[in-house]
């Protein structure tokens, strides 16, 4: 007996909220597999080879992973060469602004933004950074 993943309407709703971001971001792709669900690929922009993949089985997982990637995109634009776990207050404001169009479509997932920034803040508490 073969197992088949089911792409729920909620998963499709989450994917559609990120469609503009996915179309404009060359370093990632999102694929659907009936065997494993959504597959999030990171792509090396120089070699055009996949670097990693992650299986995502639920709408919250999918949304969280894409919000994480959006935050990383903002951090890379700062050219400070660090990830979002080291962001400062101004960068947190930029990340929230970048997330805004998606969260307007998915207000029930706004809590994920808070979780991401809270985790970043917890990682930086020893440095006295306040991301709120």
Per-segment meaning from a language model:
Residues 19-21, 28-32, 53:
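Short, exposed beta-strand/loop patches in secreted or surface proteins that constitute
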Residues 129-132:
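Non-Sec secretion/translocation targeting segments of pathogen effectors
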Residues 34-120:
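Acidic, low-complexity, intrinsically disordered interaction modules
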Residues 2-25:
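Negatively charged, low-complexity tracts enriched in Asp/Glu with abundant Ser/Thr
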Residues 25-28, 36-38:
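Short, surface-exposed beta-edge/turn micro-motifs
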């Amino acid at each position: 007996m073969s197992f088949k993943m089911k792409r729920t309407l909620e998963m499709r709703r989450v994917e559609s909220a990120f469609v503009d971001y996915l179309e404009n971001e060359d370093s990632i792709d999102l694929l659907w597999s009936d065997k494993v669900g959504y597959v999030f690929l990171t792509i090396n922009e120089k070699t055009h080879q996949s670097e990693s993949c992650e299986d995502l089985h639920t709408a919250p997982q999918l949304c969280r992973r894409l919000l994480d990637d959006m935050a990383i995109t903002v951090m890379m634009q700062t050219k400070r060469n660090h990830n979002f776990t080291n962001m400062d207050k101004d960068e947190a404001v930029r990340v929230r602004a970048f997330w805004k169009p998606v969260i307007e479509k998915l207000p029930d997932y706004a809590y994920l933004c808070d979780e991401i920034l809270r985790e970043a803040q917890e990682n930086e508490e020893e440095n006295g950074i306040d991301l709120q």
